[in-house]
Structure formats: C-alpha cells, structure tokens
Amino acid sequence: EGGSTAGLSATPPASLPGSLTNVKALQKSPGPQRERKSSSSSEDRNRMKTLGRRDSSDDWEIPDGQITVGQRIGSGSFGTVYKGKWHGDVAVKMLNVTAPTPQQLQAFKNEVGVLRKTRHVNILLFMGYSTKPQLAIVTQWCEGSSLYHHLHIIETKFEMIKLIDIARQTAQGMDYLHAKSIIHRDLKSNNIFLHEDLTVKIGDFGLATVKSRWSGSHQFEQLSGSILWMAPEVIRMQDKNPYSFQSDVYAFGIVLYELMTGQLPYSNINNRDQIIFMVGRGYLSPDLSKVRSNCPKAMKRLMAECLKKKRDERPLFPQILASIELLARSLPKIHRSASEPSLNRAGFQTEDFSLYACASPKTPIQA
C-alpha cells in the first residue's frame, strides 16, 4: 500500500520508507493465533473465557485507540492511506464510508474473513481491521518503492531478466488472490512494490469484492481505480458489477506494457475524459509498437492476449503464470547463447534480451 491513488491520478508519492521488522512478531500475536481454536495454552483458554463466544473475523478487529495514525501517504476512490504504528510500522487504509449500515458492516467483515486467510510472499500481509472511529484495513508496511516510482519517476535501469521476474512474481501473487476468489479491482504499478528491490509485494487488495460474499451494498460499485489500467467493460459500467478476474487480467496487461515499454499507455493524450470515452467504446488500445525490439515475442503475445477488448477472450492467471514461467525458464539458455559465437546471429537481436535496460524519457500522464 502507499502508491497514491488520488482520484483517478496515475501519479503516486515518491517512495515508502518503513520497516518490516515487526511483522514476524505480529504474526505471533494473540490476534492471529485466535484463528487456531485448538490451542491448549491456559492463557488462550482464559482469553476465550474473557472474550466469550465470538465470530472468527472479530478476533482480527483492532480496538479503537490502539493504532497511532501518522503521515498521510495517499488517497484514492476507496479511501486514504496513512503510515501508522501498531506494535511497529503498519499501513492504515481508512475507507470512504461514513456511518456504515449493518449490511455494509457485515459485508466488510465477510471480506475480512477471507483476507485474514491470505498468506503469500507476493502480497502485503493483512494484519487486522478497525471499525472505530471508521472502517479501516491494516496491512504490513512495505519498505521499498512502487513499480510506478521505479519505472516512471527515477527510471531504474532494470535488466530484462529482472523485468520478466517482476511480471512472474506479480502474476504469482494475482494467481493466489484469484484462487481465494479475491478480485483486486485496482491492480496497477502504483500498487506493486519492490521490497528491497527484490520481492514483489501486491498491495491495496484489501478492498477487493469477494465473489459470493458481498452482501448487496453498492457503496463501492462506482468508477474506481486509475483509468489507464481499467478494462473497457469497467469503464462502461453497464453491468451491475463489471469487475471480474478478467478485468484484473486487463490491468495486468497494462502493467506488462509498462514493464516492456518503460512508458504509460496513451502518452499522447492528456485528456482524461477522452481516454475514458475511447477505451470504453473500443476505439483506443495501448500501442504495442512501442514495445522494445528486444522484448521476447512470447511476452508481447501474452500482453496482447491480456489486453483483449472482449473480457471472455482474455486468459486467466493460471495460464498467464504458466506462460511467464516457461519464458523465464528459457532465459538462462538465451543468455548463454547470446555470448557464444554463431554463424547465424542475424536477426537474433530481437530475442537477445539479457542486457535490456528500461531507461527512456517518460512523461507520466495525469489521467
């Protein structure tokens, strides 16, 4: 968490300083352990007697007053993110819901019931939630900059091998979320963080609508997220709920575009409403001719598949992950052959991507 989602802006704050040193301790705290009802410790039994009969998701509620809210990091259509303190550094997302109805509160707790079970190396750790003074989700604080910041602000020179690994880790995290029936709804480079420049951490999935568990409130069924990553059907908003696994796949396709071009799509259009109109009606697609010549052909094909205008024509993440893993396994062989003599080197440059660096002038779009 931490990339700015202000309105529909594509511009995030610069970086996310912080600490993850307390995460392990927090995982051992009484809150998460409460999920294991079979604990035999007398301390846990006494706590159960004190707390009485409770719903399992309630065990993750952080009482009012325990979280110290600090610096504002960014805001978006769903809420505002702050750096906070709760047994260490945490990210606190305050939701844009005032005086929630009982139905909204129950829907929120239903979602928490799924989020509390998410544990994956490529997603930010969910640590708890609060309902007072307002609904908030608390996650691990990620030390590292967003992918957006790396690509479009400081123009980090990533080798192609690293870019493909970022894509692989992102697909791996999304495949896990979808296996849990969690739709991200706002996947973008602002919400993908590189912890210590090595490990991908997907953030801001805490407001994903969980299939079959959302209880009918349309509080969040408004145009949300940044438009550059929105699938055409999401922009059109013709369906009751246009978000789907495939709309996440489209957003991932835009992330691939960022990785393989070093640019944002539609860089020649500065009018937000024009982008919404043209993408929503199928008149505008990312210009794949801007993909670098040394981008693997298989990656370019995958990108085009993810960016299909018709939702049902896009692949799902199990297939996407398998494709990227297959490509990644071919990297050592290609890397070796690139350094060996060959009588047939003509034309090889299009696939020789071991020394690719993502560094070109870019002008981030205010979309």
From Swiss-Prot:
Protein kinase domain residues: 67-327
Key words of the record: ATP-binding, Kinase, Nucleotide-binding, Oncogene, Serine/threonine-protein kinase, Transferase
Span list, region Disordered: 1-64
Active site feature: 186
Residues that bind ATP: 73-81, 93
A GO molecular function held by the record: protein serine/threonine kinase activity
Extra remark beyond the main annotation: This protein is synthesized as a Gag-Rmil polyprotein.
Protein name as it appears in the record: Serine/threonine-protein kinase-transforming protein Rmil
Species whose genome carries this gene: Avian retrovirus IC10
Gene this protein is translated from: V-RMIL
